[in-house]
């Protein structure tokens, strides 16, 4: 009987009930796959207000598995989850860099999310439980000032390393009710402006409240929110809902995860 209850408690419905009742909540889904997978964070790109974005990434498959001739794909989405660009990169170096400007995105001045996936036809050194996750560093420069870099913050999507074109989400788990409160460990006093970047890495609508204002973020949408208070608490129905922070002081820009 205990084994049956435990099994039911770990199903998708069981986890949803646990999270909604705040009974042994689960923040991340355990990925039970019989093939090696590539996981990507939901990275932010910005080309609005004089911004450009720089992305630094590694050839993970060669670095750790000595697999040659692998490649990566970048998938760029608008803030409303519209696919706007896919780019395949072959001939990887150990360390690589991509600059994302408005020109790169067909003169689009906005913001959104992008994902990076590692693919290979060579499976010699991989087993079916391997998970490739390139957390990477993303830099942001406004008006050609110095870049401020931050590493990956939110696990977003995953796919087979064999490039089968099926992309799955819901690594981060939600609940039915807004039961979860996260207070950012930062005092926002002394800055000219502060922005929080949110992305929804799930297939469910995330409902959240900041500074007594209610928001709804549809699946895989993203949103920039300017804040005014010195201490910020986020109440939501997502168990891991952590924004990227942009803090401005004169010409100084500080970007970091919360």
Predicted regions located by residue number:
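Gly/Pro-rich, tryptophan- and cysteine-flecked surface segments typical
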Residues: 1-258
């Amino acid at each position: 009987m205990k084994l049956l209850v435990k099994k039911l408690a770990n199903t998708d419905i069981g986890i949803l009930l646990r999270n909604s009742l705040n009974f042994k909540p689960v923040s991340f889904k355990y990925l039970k796959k019989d093939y090696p997978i590539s996981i990507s964070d939901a990275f932010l790109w910005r080309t609005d207000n004089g911004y450009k974005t720089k992305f630094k990434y590694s050839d993970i498959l060669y670095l750790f598995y000595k697999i040659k001739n692998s490649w990566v794909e970048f998938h760029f989405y608008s803030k409303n989850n519209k696919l706007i660009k896919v780019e395949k990169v072959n001939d990887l170096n150990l360390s690589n860099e991509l600059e994302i400007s408005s020109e790169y995105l067909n003169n689009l001045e906005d913001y959104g999310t992008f994902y990076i996936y590692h693919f290979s036809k060579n499976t010699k050194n991989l087993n079916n439980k391997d998970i490739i996750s390139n957390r990477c560093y993303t830099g942001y420069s406004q008006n050609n000032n110095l870049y401020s870099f931050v590493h990956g913050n939110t696990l977003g999507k995953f796919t087979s390393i064999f490039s089968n074109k099926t992309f799955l989400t819901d690594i981060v788990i939600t609940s039915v009710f807004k039961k979860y409160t996260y207070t950012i460990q930062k005092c926002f006093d002394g800055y000219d402006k502060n922005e929080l970047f949110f992305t929804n890495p799930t297939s469910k609508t995330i409902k959240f409240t900041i500074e007594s204002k209610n928001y709804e973020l549809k699946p895989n949408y993203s949103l920039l929110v300017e804040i005014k208070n010195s201490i910020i608490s986020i109440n939501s129905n997502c168990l891991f809902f952590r924004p990227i922070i942009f803090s401005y002081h004169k010409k100084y820009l500080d970007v970091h995860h919360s």
